[in-house]
Amino acid sequence: MSRRLRVDDWLSVEHSNVPDGSWLTMMSRVASFHHKARFSSEGNHGHDMGFRIALTVEELGELSAAITKGKPDEEAAEELADLLILLLGHSLAMEVDLEEEFHKKMDKVMTRKARKGKLGIRVTDYSDD
C-alpha cells in the first residue's frame, strides 16, 4: 500500500468523529475539512504555504496570548488544536507523509543530548563551539 499524501488519498479513509487515538482519524478529518472548504482550488490559496505560515503565526500568537494572559486551560487547548489542524493541513498542502517524517525526526532527536540554556532545557544539535 502506498502512503497517503494528498487530500483525495485521505477522503476514502473511514474515520470516527470522536477521539479514538488514531492518526488516520485525525488526518482524514483534516482532509475532509480541506475538501469541504476547497482549499486546493485555484484562487483559494488554501494550500499556498506562504499564506499557511502566516495563519500558523496568527494561531501561535493566539495560543501565546491565552497562556500569557492566564486564560482558562480550555482556551489554550483550543488554540493548540488550531495549530495541530494547521500542521496536519500543511502536510496535505505539501503532500508530505507527516507520520513518517515524525518518526524519522524522533529517531534523530532521541540520539541528541539535552542542553540547558538561559531560558531552560532543550534538545538540539546546535553547538555554540
Predicted regions and their residues:
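Flexible "arm" and connector segments at domain edges
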Residues: 1-80, 84-129
